[in-house]
């Protein structure tokens, strides 16, 4: 947000903060969310690069298309286990997954 807009909002009585502050998230919770989102993004990138539909991926991982959509959207109900297993099914190595997680905070 630009400085002028921030000053206008604060002058009008608004409090400016971060999502983390608003939701009261700890640094550990933020890191976990960022890791899951990075894994979700990697799944979508892999699916698209392999020209696969969500339905086709769902069949491959023995799940539903709606579950794949939730995985790609970063839905909090998606387990870390399913995200990692899906990347492994795509042929990702442990090193590949580690790199996704390592770069999740950048």
Locate predicted features:
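N-terminal flexible/basic segments that precede or flank functional cores
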Residues: 1-38, 98-106
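Short basic helix-loop element that most often maps to the first helix and adjoining turn
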Residues: 12, 41-56, 85
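Alpha-helix N-cap/N′ positions at the starts of helices
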Residues: 38-39, 63
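Residue-level detection of the helix-turn-helix DNA-binding "recognition helix"
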Residues: 48, 62, 73-75, 102
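Short alpha-helical DNA-recognition segment
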Residues: 50-70
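DNA major-groove recognition helix of helix-turn-helix/homeodomain DNA-binding modules
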Residues: 62, 79-97
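Alpha-helical DNA-recognition elements
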Residues: 70, 74, 85
């Amino acid at each position: 947000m630009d400085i002028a807009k921030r000053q206008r909002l604060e002058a009008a009585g608004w409090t400016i903060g971060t999502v983390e502050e608003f939701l009261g998230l700890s640094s550990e919770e933020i890191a976990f969310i960022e890791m899951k989102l990075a894994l979700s993004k990697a799944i979508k990138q892999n699916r698209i690069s392999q020209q696969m539909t969500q339905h086709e991926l769902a069949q491959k991982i023995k799940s539903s298309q709606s579950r794949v959509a939730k995985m790609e959207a970063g839905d909090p109900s998606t387990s870390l286990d399913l995200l990692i297993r899906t990347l492994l099914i795509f042929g990702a190595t442990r090193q590949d997954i580690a790199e996704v997680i390592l770069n999740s905070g950048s």
